[in-house]
Amino acid sequence: MKVKAGIFNPLVPDKVVEVEGIVDTGAVYTVIRRDVLEGLGIRPVKRGRFKALGSYVERDVGEAGLVLMGERRVVPVIFGEAEDVLVIGLTALEIFGLEVDPVRGTLKEAELLLL
């Protein structure tokens, strides 16, 4: 499912870059191209090893501000390569309290559980 989102540096929240990507509930993390993140002054905080398409890749990891449906949150992100598509993963959806409505093909507020 395609979605429009805003990306911002939590330390400079007024500068927002509008992007288009896909929501993938099978992806744990959000992937944003490195050039977009670095253009906002977002730096990696660590490097991680991830399984992707049957093999392993190493990518930098950081935190970025994300705007979805008018709400702003800070989410963990993977620094994507030039060929990577922007992906909004399940962790970001949970932080926002959102889920996919498969009938309408949109995002909607999720029923939140307190466990």
Locate predicted features.
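Pepsin/retropepsin-fold aspartyl endopeptidases
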Residues: 1-115
